[in-house]
Regions:
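Cytosolic ends of transmembrane helices, especially the final helix of ABC transmembrane type-1 domains
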Residues: 1-17
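Primarily ABC-family ATPase nucleotide-binding module
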Residues: 17-64, 221
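The feature captures the beta-strand-to-loop junction immediately N-terminal to the Walker
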Residues: 69-71
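Helix-to-loop junction immediately C-terminal to a conserved catalytic motif
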Residues: 84-85
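Conserved ABC transporter NBD signature motif
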Residues: 92-101, 110
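Conserved "ABC signature" C-loop
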Residues: 122-169
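Catalytic Walker B motif of ABC-type/P-loop ATPase nucleotide-binding domains
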Residues: 198-202
């Protein structure tokens, strides 16, 4: 391995080791969230002077889709991560899930049962198609439900094949998975998990317009039972939201 590669790897390990230990909290969160309240939230990453948020206050209520907007570098992705319980030791102000302060909630239970998060660059697991799609599920969904989502997002060629067998390894049918296909898989994971709070970071950046419409229709269909926060630069996605919060 080249010296430069070793140096980069060591620096990355040191960065990870420098991360503060995440507070766990002891309150078991409800899997039915009616409101998220942010009060005077301020945040900047450690070892930087740049303030991403300053005294931000806003509420998110079940039954609504919220678009988080703002220019590049304004902290949109960071804001979703804060609600996801990340970087809480560097946060000032309060974030409450229902009436419980986020800092006092058990973060593992929160992410396992209450919050779902799709990242800008979703990860694919070296495992079966079924396990990739049900990665976030507490209870195993029926094959029929999984297959319906696969067909809805036009992933039959990648994931089903003629045998409709979900227990083959994901990379056996295709050696290369596109960014759009990864985003579709991440969206299906979210839908199968069905968390009370859905956090979607640029979920449509690599999707074709038909798939964008499919996602928006799904979100509108399920929003009555959820709080949905999403980030997107697509005007069509922002317009589909019930409310916008500009950072």
């Amino acid at each position: 391995m080249a010296y430069q590669s070793i140096t980069v790897s060591i620096n990355r390990i040191e960065q990870i080791l420098d991360l503060p230990q995440e507070p766990v909290g002891n309150i078991i969160p409800s899997d039915n969230v009616n409101q998220i309240t942010c009060t005077n939230v301020s945040f900047s990453y450690p070892h930087t002077n740049k303030v991403l948020m300053n005294n931000l206050s806003c509420d998110f209520v079940k039954g609504n889709i919220y678009a988080i907007t703002g220019g590049n570098g304004t902290g949109k992705s960071t804001f979703l991560k804060l609600i996801n319980g990340e970087w809480s030791s560097h946060l000032s102000g309060d974030i409450a899930i229902n009436e419980d302060l986020l800092a006092q909630i058990n973060q593992y239970e929160l992410r396992k049962n209450t919050l779902g998060f799709t990242e800008q660059e979703p990860s694919i697991v070296d495992d079966t198609e079924r396990n990739n799609l049900t990665l976030l599920c507490k209870n195993q969904p029926k094959d029929e439900e999984i297959i319906n989502y696969i067909k809805l997002f036009n992933l039959e060629k990648l994931l089903l094949g003629d045998d409709q067998n979900l227990d083959v390894r994901l990379n056996e049918r295709s050696s290369a998975i596109s960014g759009g296909e990864k985003q579709k898989i991440a969206i299906i994971r979210m839908m199968l998990m069905n968390p009370s709070v859905m956090l979607l970071d640029e979920p449509t950046s690599a999707l074709d317009q038909k798939s964008v419409e499919v996602l928006l229709n799904l979100l509108k269909k399920v929003k009555k039972d959820h709080i949905i926060l999403l980030i997107s630069h697509d005007p069509k996605v922002v317009e589909a939201a019930d409310h916008t919060v500009e950072l």
